[in-house]
Curated annotation (Swiss-Prot):
Keywords: 2Fe-2S, Amino-acid biosynthesis, Branched-chain amino acid biosynthesis, Iron, Iron-sulfur, Lyase, Magnesium, Metal-binding. This is Dihydroxy-acid dehydratase. The keyword S-adenosyl-L-methionine does not apply. The lineage of its organism: Bacteria, Pseudomonadati, Pseudomonadota, Gammaproteobacteria, Moraxellales. Its EC number is 4.2.1.9. Mg(2+) binds at residues 81, 123-124, 491. It comes from Acinetobacter baumannii (strain ATCC 17978 / DSM 105126 / CIP 53.77 / LMG 1025 / NCDC KC755 / 5377).
Amino acid sequence: MPDYRSKTSTHGRNMAGARGLWRATGMKDEDFGKPIIAVVNSFTQFVPGHVHLKDLGQLVAAEIQAAGGVAKEFNTIAVDDGIAMGHDGMLYSLPSRDLIADSVEYMVNAHCADAMVCISNCDKITPGMLMAAMRLNIPVVFVSGGPMEAGKVKFRGDEKAIDLVDAMVVAADDSYTDEEVAEFERSACPTCGSCSGMFTANSMNCLTEALGLSLPGNGSIVATHANRKKLFLKAGQLIVELAKRYYEQNDASILPRSIATKAAFKNAMTLDIAMGGSTNTVLHLLAAANEAEVDFTMDDIDELSRRVPVLSKVAPAKQDVHMEDVHRAGGIMAILGELDRANLLDVSVPTVHEKTLKDALDKWDIIRTEDPDVYEFYRSSPGGVPTQVAFSQNRYYSTLDGDREKGVIRNAEHAFSKDGGLAVLYGNIALDGCIVKTAGVDESILKFTGSARVFESQDAAVEAILGNEIKAGDVVVIRYEGPRGGPGMQEMLYPTSYLKSKGLGKDCALVTDGRFSGGSSGLSIGHVSPEAAEGGAIGLVEDGDTIEIDIPNRTIHLNIDDATLAHRRTVQEAKGWHPKEERKRKVSKALKVYAMHTTSAAKGAVRIL
């Protein structure tokens, strides 16, 4: 039977000094021998998805104490991708994921914590904490801050639901007045919480449900609803139970690596494809699997994408549907329930809250349960009042959305499409693969052939788009924006949004070794691997080259002969793999260190050891 890790610093005469310090934090004689639970918070006033988390760590801590544990809270950093977007701040977003993972490891191992509750929410925070959980392999429960409510705007006689991306698109569209743009801006993000669509933050919080590491509703119930408080209270109680099961009953089945097995990662990716999640989730699942020492690769993702249907379309794929609508339809447990009925899941895998995923679905899938409390939970609705306060309203929808033919969540028979919302493409421009969010691509351009317009940075591409230099039929190629080349693998939300603003959302493609925001849609192909800085063929594309994209057949092809491609490679290798034009970009020492040690997107942009 394993000893409590905390015993290292709480027992023995040689630890008198450490115990003295523990006492100075409030511990008493009776606390030594109890499990020490790290409450890993990520409160910050910089990020709307985290601004309401300040007191929630202590809410969880109180439940831990009441359940017989000792709670000790610390904070991680949290970068807001939306605020960091469109300037050099975005260089820091992806590297912050690894910094968060390291900081959690440092704090938990330095202080010998026995277990942890991870309070996350936005884009890189959940992945960073997930990587740390897999690395540490101690009992853990994830609980996120929750989605913000969708914005509402009365525009030219109609009321519509909007989000951050809508504000960005109209801001670059000259047909809107300054007053109209300001109204979108004021209305887009009305409450605390992660941005309201199926963007990266919400995608990752949904995936923790599928991985079995968080409670039902974690990914979907809005941050403002009183029922979300129940998740935090339950997390505090549950983590003490899990810690005692492992350390006092020798039950290793509740450890993260026992729960997040390859089968669980495949379940999570199956969910991701079915709900049209952010392409960033591919990076993060690959990275988490790497930490868990699970053999989960791009090939697994490719195989799943060919047979998993799209069962839900949420903004940005369907602009009038947001996470609050997914919750009303039964949340993630409902999507998993439909996938189970289509025989696309392994429901024998365990979770932190039920013995198996099957047991969880029997209890929480609104189609199969008869529990009125579950029905009420999923009727939790937005409050419609701007606020930065968690759990501040208690409104309910009058009915659930159980329509599986035309509703927000469909069954497999009535799927939006028969193959997945994410796809892996291969070809001579992406030998190790690239990713496209097919759920956000119009059917008319699933096959697309166009002429390359090559840019050595996101900034240059944005300037060309806003300057009306991009025309229908162009393939915008943005390179040297990968994990090494950026460095930091910037998101390309501005270029995709501006293409929409110019009316080119269905007439152009964008191909990059960078990545896309979860808010991006359109024919946006990212994570091209190998990246240009690694000698990838994207670094050999020239203006005017023809690029053929065939999503149904999962191919992307630079239409030049092998001899020409080989000649270009010889010339480029002599010059070195770097942008042809000098970029106005300040790369700090921290970013240079990141660039030296990161791998390609095809491997999750994890570090080389």
